Amino acid sequence: MNLESKGVRLVALASLFGLAAISSVRADVPTDLRLDLVAMSRLPTQAQRTSALSNLLPRWVAVDLDTARLTVENWPDESARPMLLGETAWYWGERDVRAALDWAKGLRLENERYAAVRSAIRRFPYEAAREARAEVLRLPAGKIRDKVAEQLVEEFHRGREAAEWCAAYPDAIVAPILVRKVTRSWILTAFVKDANLNAESELIEEWAFELSDIRLREAAFAGALDGFCRLIYYPRPCREPQPIRRLLRYIDDGVLREQLTSEINEAWQKKFPDDVGNPTTVRK
């Protein structure tokens, strides 16, 4: 088959492997990419074809989005399809995040929709965090929206504004989960930026005490403690017992307080085995 001839269509062995969409690749697609697509269609196993497609997607989406998208939507390996759809949304979102998100929201299966929506939402830049959060709330209520919200909070949403959004999240079960994640991220980010951790902890406490819902308040304190616990394991470990002791005193739930105390002490003893003390003892 002469790939250089005008108007050529990639047929190769595509139809045998459920890759019929490849036969619609535009003639102006670079020859090297078309050759790679033919080579992909000739690979002997589905796993090999899936891996090859994943590697080709950045180039393919950039020059022939419609055919790439159609191929991924109809990919015969159902277990790999969410991953491929997520990658397609990611590469598409680099140049048009809203178009990628609209496409992702229209996918048929829930696991595929989630993978693509998650990737598209992640394409919003840090400066557009408020816009990204607004897009999350435009998603239909349910598992996909909740999981995407958790991912956003974990990845790049920090500080009081993000915390307030988490506290106001329109699901009473999910909101405390988001609050705990956002205050954890708040502490971790403060550490990376060499901020005063005691002062940052006080900002979290100040905000948390404004919350009327005790579940959200305790989640805020617990998240900050999760952050301090994680920092103990850092290469440049945090040794700030004062905010840890203070935050523990604010938690009324005895079971939660004991759990956090145990986790922090265990982390401390692993990191500092020669330290006879621990960071959770409240000194009077």
Question: What does each of the following model-derived ranges do?
Answer:
Residues 2-12:
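Bacterial N-terminal signal peptides that target proteins for export
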Residues 11-21:
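Bacterial N-terminal signal peptides
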Residues 24-284:
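Non-catalytic all-alpha helical scaffold/repeat segments
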